Curated annotation (Swiss-Prot):
Family: Belongs to the FGGY kinase family.
Sequence positions that bind ADP: 11, 15, 264, 316, 421, 425
A molecular-function term among this protein's GO annotations: ATP binding
Any single biological process term in GO: glycerol-3-phosphate metabolic process
Keywords noted in UniProt: ATP-binding, Glycerol metabolism, Kinase, Nucleotide-binding, Transferase
Protein name, entry field: Glycerol kinase
Pfam families: FGGY_C, FGGY_N
The keyword Transmembrane helix appears for this protein: no
Binding residues for ATP: 11-13, 264, 316, 320, 421
The protein's annotated pathway: Polyol metabolism; glycerol degradation via glycerol kinase pathway; sn-glycerol 3-phosphate from glycerol: step 1/1
Top-level division of the source organism's lineage: Bacteria
Amino acid sequence: MTYLLALDQGTSSSRSIVFDERGHIVAQAQQELPQIYPQPGWVEHDPVDIWRTQIATARQALAQANIGPGDVRALGITNQRETTVLWNRRTGQPVHHAIVWQDRRAEPLCAELREQGHEPMIQERTGLRIDAYFSATKLRWLLDQVPGARAAAEAGELAFGTVDSWLIWQLTGGKVHVTDVSNASRTMLFNVHSNDWDDDLLALLRIPRKLLPRVQPSASDFGATDAALLGGAIPIGGVAGDQQSALFGQACFTAGMAKNTYGTGCFMLMHTGSSFQTSRNGLLTTSAAQIAPRTGAGHGAPEPAFAMEGSVFVGGAVVQWLRDGLRAISSSSEVQSLAESVPDSGGVMMVPAFTGLGAPYWKPDARGTITGLTRGTTIAHIARAALESIAYQSAALLQAMSRDAVAAGGAPVSELRVDGGACVNDLLMQFQADLLGIPVVRPAVIETTALGAAYLAGLSSGVYAGTEALSALWRAERRFLPTLSAARAQECMARWEHAVRQAALD
């Protein structure tokens, strides 16, 4: 039997999953990742915790599967994107906590860049809007605010990376400083047309090029693990940011195919093939996972692959807020039964703009609201409104995506594949299909983020001949079909847009 090991380093936990070559889960392990909130709007992780929890789960998963490193053909890595790590090349120690993708401390710098008129140039080169969400301004903050960091960076003593780079550095004993194209494309420093770091952007943000990792295709040779870590060396053959990895794991390989991941946030991606498309509807363009040619893996010229993306900052996190903030539930699993205890939200609308609103609105100053309260409102109505807010935000993304697809000469999205922890909530998935008016399809294996990393590693190591073999492995577990009329769905979305305007104080 051939096995693949996927390391899935997320915002709230580190996980490792052993897959067989059919994409079935053989074993898995998970550890929570401590969250650090130094100030309002700031979110950090300790890079040492990231590494400690990730390597521990890898060992646990291998032990649970009762296999050794010699049984694993290759290892794949997928990770929370944009989260920024800066460390000392000699000691391997971080110079500061990692600044997490949710962190908003760099917003003043972003506002300054927008006021200076740089956004059109940045969007054309990177596919991204100027936002504190991305790595570039987080890295600039570290260089400016950590004592001695800029001088050390300019002397070549420091290394920058997103979480994948940090893990590869640790896994290889500091021998390899590298990232993949999908993670690089989320930094706001990477030119997606030239497939390289952009010198003009580096100069604009005062970031020394010598800080940056080498960039490779997502399915290519990233080195091998230090033999002492897992009892033997394992080739690292696949790396992708979590959302591009989920797109790959959902077998969305052709233009027009779309997926939505329901996690801490929600992340919708639509494959656009080899064409770079600039959104006119508030979405981002990002590099999809790229596959190196079989010859000279890691150094060939893969065919470009792009995706349109929309990100919801607060998705499943709204359920955590119900539990930890309002104490309305004692565990996240209770939310479906509580929401199902009422037939609808009773007119309550929740906009969970706790850290502003992401795509397609891009309202960093928006704040969370609950409207439509009456004397008859119960906590069940609020719970249902919280769940529905996840679907409303995702529906706004898909509608924007379909408009962009039609403008580019394509067709609207006709089916949405779903994954992530919250996709097991049948109430949420049915309401999502009702709002969208298209089938929402849940796969047999919902761990598609980790599966995508395993598939990438399998491609580079020869387990799979190509993406056609992966498409043949994909299976649906359930299709949710719309039950609302188009007119009723439009009424619901109109109420949502009104609530968004209130939250944004428009």
